[in-house]
């Protein structure tokens, strides 16, 4: 009896579960860790980079992409299965088409919430249709609207979405989120560089080998998505390490 609810997408179990949706959410928890932070004049996206094959071109393995000139997205997928990475590609392509269609019809760009709601609605439809399965992705969607205010939304495989000041998704989301809850303050995002460093610090809580395993991007108002090179990320990591050393020295002096 239990296996029937386990396999059916559109049938609730007696205790109110949609197991296929819950399995998709578990798949997301095994994906790369991604973090998004709203600054005053900037939004930062950071993603844990998984190691690639020796002969593979790492430029083709991206977790951050632009949906429109003012909206971008990072996603967490179970990268060991290419099918779920392909899920992200389908959602990205649908969202990009919707951005362009909206611009042609209304003659205005989409708002960040509009495209987030579109993606969430698409995901939700795949939780109540026979012959389909839920998308195995969770996404952080960021950008700026005409009012100049930065936005950050998160969606999950069930089709729900929420606005955040800072959030994390993926395998170590809980650890990163706890770090952000302790360290996200107005001072921590007062400048662009401080917001960038906060995102890197959050990822360094769970990422091994420092900056070389971090993919970082920022978006500013009226500016396109900017991807950081590995060298740029390493410079920030070096600066963070120096700040830690100086803080430890000050503590040791006080204790003496």
Swiss-Prot record:
UniProt subcellular location: Nucleus
What's any GO biological process attached to this entry? spermatogenesis
Q: Which UniProt keywords apply?
A: Differentiation, Nucleus, Proteasome, Spermatogenesis
Q: Which residues cross the membrane?
A: none
Q: State the GO CC annotations.
A: cytoplasm; extracellular exosome; nucleus; proteasome core complex, alpha-subunit complex; spermatoproteasome complex
Disulfide pattern: none
Which InterPro entries does the record associate with it? Ntn_hydrolases_N, Proteasome_alpha, Proteasome_alpha-type, Proteasome_asu_N, Proteasome_sua/b
Q: Which Gene3D superfamilies match?
A: Glutamine Phosphoribosylpyrophosphate, subunit 1, domain 1
According to the record's subunit comment, the protein's assembly and interactions are: Component of the outer alpha-ring of the 20S proteasome core which is composed of 28 subunits that are arranged in four stacked rings, resulting in a barrel-shaped structure. The catalytic chamber with the active sites is on the inside of the barrel. Interacts with canonical subunits of the spermatoproteasome, including proteasome activators PSME4 (also called PA200) and PSME3 (also called PA28-gamma). Interacts with proteasome-interacting proteins chaperones, ubiquitin ligases and ubiquitin specific proteases.
Function field: Component of the spermatoproteasome, a proteasome specifically found in testis that promotes acetylation-dependent degradation of histones, thereby participating actively to the exchange of histones during spermatogenesis. The proteasome is a protein complex that degrades unneeded or damaged proteins by proteolysis, a chemical reaction that breaks peptide bonds. Required for 20S core proteasome assembly, essential for the degradation of meiotic proteins RAD51 and RPA1 at late prophase I and the progression of meiosis I during spermatogenesis.
Family recorded in the similarity comment:
Belongs to the peptidase T1A family.
* Protein's UniProt name: Proteasome subunit alpha-type 8
Q: Which species is the source of this protein?
A: Homo sapiens
The lineage is: Eukaryota, Metazoa, Chordata, Craniata, Vertebrata
> What is the primary gene name for this protein?
PSMA8
């Amino acid at each position: 009896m239990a296996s029937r609810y386990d396999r059916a997408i559109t049938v609730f179990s007696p205790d109110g579960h949609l197991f296929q949706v819950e399995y998709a959410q578990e798949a997301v928890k095994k994906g790369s860790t991604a973090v998004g932070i709203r600054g005053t004049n900037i939004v930062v996206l950071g993603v844990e980079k998984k190691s690639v094959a020796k002969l593979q071109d790492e430029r083709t393995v991206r977790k951050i992409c632009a949906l429109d000139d003012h909206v971008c997205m990072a996603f967490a997928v179970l990268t060991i299965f290419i099918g779920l990475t392909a899920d992200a590609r389908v959602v990205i392509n649908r969202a990009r088409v919707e951005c362009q269609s909206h611009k042609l019809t209304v003659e205005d760009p989409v708002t960040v919430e509009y495209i987030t709601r579109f993606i969430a609605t698409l995901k939700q439809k795949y939780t109540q249709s026979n012959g389909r399965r839920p998308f195995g992705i969770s996404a952080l969607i960021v950008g700026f609207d005409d009012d100049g205010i930065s936005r950050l939304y998160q969606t999950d495989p069930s089709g729900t979405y929420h606005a955040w000041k800072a959030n994390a998704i993926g395998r170590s989301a809980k650890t990163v989120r706890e770090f952000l809850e302790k360290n996200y303050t107005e001072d921590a995002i007062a400048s662009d560089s401080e917001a960038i460093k906060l995102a890197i610090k959050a990822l360094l809580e769970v990422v091994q080998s420092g900056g070389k395993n971090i993919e970082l991007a920022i978006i500013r108002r009226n500016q396109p998505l900017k991807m950081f090179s590995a060298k740029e990320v390493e410079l920030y990591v070096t600066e963070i390490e120096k700040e830690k050393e100086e803080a430890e020295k000050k503590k040791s002096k006080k204790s003496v």
